[in-house]
Amino acid sequence: MATDLKTSFAGIELKNPIIASASPMTMSVEQCVQLEKAGVAAIVVKSIFEESVHYNANRLSDMQAHGEENYYLDGYIGEHMLTEWREQLRAIKSNCTIPVIASIAGVNLKTWERYAKAAVEEGADGLELNFMNVGIADRNTLFGTIERQFVE
């Protein structure tokens, strides 16, 4: 007799408690299909990071030795990255039958809202909010400090 491993996570019904976390493995449709075949009950799609947009725009701007286009590059790269992420999320959703959870990481409220809306529009079954702060200089930052900053 098989053991029933059904459970729920954040209100999502799962056939077992195994969830593939956001990683390079969960950004490929083929890998996600393989994970599902291997028995994974849900997939957290590779995160979209707002700070990656700023980093890439700054790198391009530095290479061209002009600062004024950085403003425009931020917007262009941001739209391009969001479009690619949405397409990937849509492809994973249409090729997998298990729940697909979108992982988003923003820096400001407007971006959080934009990314969350995009995930919902692409059919994500849930959202993982990736709270982090790459600018922490103090290694003694207390547990929960970063999270409280985002909530406030």
Where are these regions (language model features)?
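Active-site entrance/lid segments in N-terminal catalytic domains of soluble metabolic enzymes
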Residues: 2-152
